[in-house]
Structures are given as C-alpha cells and as structure tokens.
Amino acid sequence: NYIPELYRRGVKNFVVTNVPKGYASDYPGANFLKVVNTLEALQRLAERHRDEFNIPIVGITGSNGKTMVKEWLYQLLSPSMFVTRSPRSYNSQIGVPLSVWLMNEQTQVGVFEAGISMPGEMLALRDIIQPTIAVLTNLGAAHQENFSSMEEKCREKLILFHDAETVIYDGDDEVISKVIAEYPDY
C-alpha cells in the first residue's frame, strides 16, 4: 500500500480501485477518485492533457535507440525552444502518460518515446502521444518473443504513425519497407 507514505510526503490526491477504510480520519484533506482500472484512468487523463496542446510532437519507437534519438533531438532543439521530453526511458504504458503529463504552457515541442513488448500496446500510447512526427529507429530482436513475426511487431509499432504528418524510418530495412508498403498513406 503506497498511500500512507505518499500522504506523509504531501500527496493529497489519489486515483484508486479501492478507497481505504477510515480514509476520512486517516488521511484528512485527501481526495480519493475511485476507478475501475487505474492504468486506464492515468492514460485517459494524459490523453486529455495532450489534447490541450497544438504543437509539434515527436513520437519515437523502435527496438533500440529510442532514448538516444530522443536525447539527440532534445540537444538539437532545446537551445532555441522549450522542449518537454520523456525522462530517462519512460516509454511504457505508465511512463508515456507520466511523460506527456510534464507538458505545460511553456512547451513548444514534445519528444516522447513509445516502447511496446506485446501486441495491442501501441494503440494506447499513440492516443496519448498523438505525434505529428513519428520516428521508427530500427526493428530488432528486442521483445520478439511476444510477436509471431518481425512483420507483426513492425505493424504494431507503425500504429504510432497513424495520424502523423511526417514519418521517418529506415527505408533500407527489408521488413520495414515491406510493411510500410502495406500503408500507402506513409
């Protein structure tokens, strides 16, 4: 149970699946929002937050190199504009919404990683990031055990590209080129 420690540290708002017994007396001034699924609640909240920004957003996916590309873009862009980026390697189902939540009124461009380890994960990340620019770094063996083929993994990663205005990928990679050819809009 993480609530007592967080409350001691000053956190007063909690999203929970079960409201703790005695919450009014044990946690005066705290608010508890009860939801069916805390992960989905976090993701939907981040999605709504992202909707508030009409700025360039770079979404980066790939088997390797996401963090390096993100940090390189940050170093390139940050001298001339305020960039919000994923901290460290926050590219998971929890890390992406926490990263997007960091955007504020100063943010001029967002740069976020999106990592997946199984089919069905990229849709939620795409809806949160909503990239205007999408980058596929490479396609490798990482997390391959949950996919039936490299093509299946590539298709899952390309979900991030759905509404992007600009798509960047390695056109020399045979698998990526083959799967990209299935999507004439790219």
List each model region and its residues:
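Short, hydrophobic beta-strand segments that form beta-sheet elements in well-ordered domains
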Residues: 11-18, 167-170, 186
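Phosphate-binding loop of NTP-binding sites
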Residues: 39-185
